[in-house]
């Protein structure tokens, strides 16, 4: 059954445009509360990132959940993975995150976590969608949900992050720059690294509700690169607005992406005989990562793009490590979802054990030239990927690379974009095919 509201990562869109409106969020809170109540007594945690609209939607969700008889525990601004962790430790039926991740402030969205801290099963999402189409009813007054606030949420999560590395860990002498993207990590990330002994310079940790992800964080890494070079830091760490993505910068200012971080963590686990199986990447993972793991005899498989698909593959195979080149890294030996702070800590521990710099560790991945071009299209128009001209051009580009590259065309699960990715061993050829395909897709979308 197809979904009406839920995308690959919850519900997301422009604030004020359906479904990202206060009245829809009220109904969504009620529908979610009714769905979770079917499993017995219902307690739901609600957290958010730092967008100004988060306060409005928090109030609407709170009212809807209460109307359904669900107790609500408010966390305030907290990273998405923190909400997953706290949902689990408070034994709540579900967790709700109000965030649009790496998108600008005028977008927002909703993600759900199950009581075990994982993404909701498909059947629960479909149940919520069915309830959204039913009239809203309010439970009798004596059964209305109560609302409370968890005041020590940040401290609990900081201690959890620190527990992901050995208790003897001391990063004294390590000089790092941390970019919090004016987002949900601003209260917790600097404390985690400082309490473990690192010297920390903090960038973009003054959210005003409007500046989240604005020319900062993992999607705009230039200021972090500059700060690392100017401050002669050992490395830089960039988070996105909700704290589930991480990219790094080495001491030379070079960007270290999710593929390379996955390699560094995977190699460390492999060296210590703690990998448990192989590593899960995605269709967008660079071919160089696959080849690097092959050299280490580490199995590597590709899931569909999206951390929920990476997680599903990990659970099915009972493996521990997976991620995306965008910086979602899932360490199942520590977390139930992508956690940027914990992933960064695993990289720092791997470097410490090996006695390497980040620049040295990343050399294990010889990345193939890869070009990604995003083409915007209007929702409701015919699917450009089903156009025979686009299919023919994609097939011809693949054939022209004669087994030395690959072409991937896909629609984003969170934005109205077609992503055109071409990868191969000849950079000029790769760029030429990518630009030609992107131009054709744009013409078809016009």
From Swiss-Prot:
Instruction: Choose any GO biological process term that the UniProt entry carries and state it.
Output: UDP-N-acetylglucosamine biosynthetic process
What superkingdom heads the lineage? Bacteria
- A Gene Ontology MF term for this entry? phosphomannomutase activity
Reactions it catalyzes: alpha-D-glucosamine 1-phosphate = D-glucosamine 6-phosphate
PROSITE patterns listed in its UniProt record: PGM_PMM (PS00710)
Write out the entry's keywords from A to Z: Isomerase, Magnesium, Metal-binding, Phosphoprotein
Q: Which family does it belong to?
A: Belongs to the phosphohexose mutase family.
What is the role of this chain? Catalyzes the conversion of glucosamine-6-phosphate to glucosamine-1-phosphate.
Which protein is depicted? Phosphoglucosamine mutase
Q: What is the lineage of its organism?
A: Bacteria, Pseudomonadati, Pseudomonadota, Gammaproteobacteria, Pseudomonadales
